[in-house]
Amino acid sequence: MAAIFDRYLQAWLDDDWDAAVALWSEDVVHHVPGRHRLAGTFRGKQAFLDHYHQVFEEVGGTIEVVGIHDVLQSEDHAVALVTERAVRGERSLEFNRVVVYHTDGEHITETWSFDFDPYSIDEFWA
């Protein structure tokens, strides 16, 4: 997992979406919690990519990682503790989240995002 996740994290930090997406399996599953309209489970690389495009469109490309506090890795998983920031119209939000990644050894096969304050996320996307 370390090599895959290290490459994924570097692509993410470099804003290199082609490199990041290449590390997703074709049947990757992305879980986004919440009650807002962008929450849900997105199955498949294209659905995951479409979700990211929708998020970026909604915030005018302003979403960014402003801090990576820690990364924990094992053979099959990585867990990242991050702070992100986004602006949507008159609203701005800086939020902490935990993202869990699962791999098959070659690709990221599943992700789960857990926001520290899910109510503020729901309100931001309302």
Predicted ranges, named:
Residues 1-16, 23:
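Short, aromatic-enriched amphipathic alpha-helices that serve as compact interaction elements
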Residues 8, 20, 28, 44, ...:
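Hydrophobic pocket/interface hotspot
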Residues 64-66, 92-99:
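Short, surface-exposed coil-to-beta transition loops
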Residues 24-25, 84-86, 99, 115:
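Short beta-strand segments enriched in hydrophobic/aromatic residues
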Residues 21-74:
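A solvent-exposed, acidic/Ser-Thr-rich amphipathic alpha-helical stretch
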